[in-house]
């Protein structure tokens, strides 16, 4: 059975470690990264953040706590409301232009990792600019960030990708399947 990631109790925490243990044991010592990642069957589902999104608390937590995989280094303060700012991004009234926000949910052959990413951009005129491009360490090494970088550039253009994430475009993320649910 897939294991969901969230606010853990002791059993859930143990289940998380069991997923990682199974994944570690499944890796062959001589197996290259690309081959192992393909065998993992990684799926990243990208969904628009809705004004009534049930994952709002997780999205705020992710933006506040992520360090290494926070490519914009933008952290909202504790009063930031994802439902007002990100959830209703397309119709947010206090700023001109179009805004868009997605959450990223990841699963692979070993389990479900839950919401592991927030990708957001805003547009005034023709150019998009990055607002958030942040991922949890739960997906570190899975190349989900590289797959999302390529997807974002294809969808909105290079101006939507943070400068710190441009190097991801050179990473082979072909082992990650992107599913868009918006």
Task: Walk through the language-model features, giving the residues of each.
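C-terminal cap/substrate-recognition subdomain and adjoining C-terminal extension
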Residues: 1-102, 110-115
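Acyl-donor binding region in acyl/amide transferases
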Residues: 108-109, 115-182
């Amino acid at each position: 059975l897939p294991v969901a990631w969230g606010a853990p109790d002791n059993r859930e925490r143990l289940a998380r470690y069991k997923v990682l243990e199974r994944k570690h044991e499944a890796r062959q010592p001589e197996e290259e990264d690309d081959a192992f990642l393909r065998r993992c069957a990684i799926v990243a589902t990208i969904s628009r953040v809705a004004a009534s999104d049930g994952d709002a608390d997780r999205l705020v937590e992710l933006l506040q706590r992520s360090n290494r995989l926070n490519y914009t280094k933008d952290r909202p303060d504790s009063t930031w409301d994802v439902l007002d700012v990100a959830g209703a991004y397309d119709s947010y009234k206090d700023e001109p232009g179009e805004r868009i926000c997605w959450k990223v949910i990841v699963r692979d052959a070993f389990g479900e990792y839950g919401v592991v990413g927030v990708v957001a951009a805003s547009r005034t005129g023709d150019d998009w600019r990055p607002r958030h491009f942040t991922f949890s360490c739960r997906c570190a090494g899975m190349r989900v960030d590289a797959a999302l970088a390529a997807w974002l550039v294809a969808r909105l253009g290079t101006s939507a990708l943070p400068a710190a994430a441009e190097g991801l475009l050179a990473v082979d993320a072909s082992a990650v399947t992107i599913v868009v649910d918006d």
